[in-house]
């Protein structure tokens, strides 16, 4: 028993020494290989630093108006444990940003879908979202809690060499039909 405890202690000491060797970022956020393979790659392919141009549908239901844009940074957590992103919108007319937000995206192999937690400056707690990749390679996200009224969903379209697109839709008839209300175009930051 004493010999066993000695071996366990040595292993624990060597593990803690390894984790303590570098800055926290290099231990948790620098390795991306685990986010670029298997199902984690579904969101891993968005890892990078993106410049966002956005548009909102106006009340008339026809006219689109440009937004203030944003910066959106996706990173790999723990070499494949999760994908985390940081949403940093631009302020109006070059002013200070209104706040920031973050998603933590974790793949559940048992259900073959993503469990996503979103929170932001001035948000009332957290939002739980579920996501699943469709046959076209797009990722469709639905709110779980808090319940949204009207219902909404988000689609991440498969990325290309030039970036990727994203849309938010709302349903005004209980989910029968969906209307795009917000669109994003992401391009690599230069």
Language-model features: where?
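N-terminal glycine/threonine-rich, aromatic-flanked beta-hairpin/loop signature
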Residues: 65-100
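Amphipathic/hydrophobic helical signal segments and adjacent flexible N-terminal regions
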Residues: 2-4, 16-64, 189-190
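Helix-adjacent hinge/juxtasegments
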Residues: 90-125
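Tryptophan-centered short beta-strand motifs
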Residues: 61-66, 95-97, 114, 175-180
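Short, surface-exposed coil-to-beta transition loops
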Residues: 67-71, 97-102, 124-128, 149-154, ...
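Short, hydrophobic/aromatic-rich segments at coil-to-beta transitions
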Residues: 47-51, 79-85, 111-116, 134-142, ...
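Bacterial N-terminal signal peptides
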Residues: 6-14
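Conserved Ser/Thr-centered positions that define the repeating blades of beta-propeller domains
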Residues: 169-171
């Amino acid at each position: 028993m004493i010999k066993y405890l000695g071996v366990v202690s040595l292993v624990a000491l060597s593990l803690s020494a390894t984790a303590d060797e570098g800055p926290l970022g290099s231990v948790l956020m620098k390795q991306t290989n685990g986010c670029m393979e298997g199902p984690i790659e579904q969101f891993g392919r968005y890892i990078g630093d993106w410049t966002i141009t956005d548009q909102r549908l106006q009340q008339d239901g026809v006219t689109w108006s440009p937004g203030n844009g944003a910066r959106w940074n996706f990173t790999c957590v723990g070499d494949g444990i999760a994908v985390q992103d940081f949403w940093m919108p631009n302020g109006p007319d070059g002013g200070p940003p209104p706040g920031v937000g973050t998603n933590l995206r974790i793949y559940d192999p048992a259900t073959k879908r993503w469990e996503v937690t979103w929170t932001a400056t001035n948000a009332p707690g957290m939002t739980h979202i579920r996501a699943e990749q469709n046959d076209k390679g797009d990722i469709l996200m639905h709110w779980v809690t808090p319940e949204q009224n009207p219902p909404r969903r988000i689609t991440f379209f498969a990325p290309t060499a030039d970036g990727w697109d994203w849309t938010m839709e709302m349903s005004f008839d209980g989910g029968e039909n969906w209307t795009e209300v917000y669109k994003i175009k992401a391009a690599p930051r230069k």
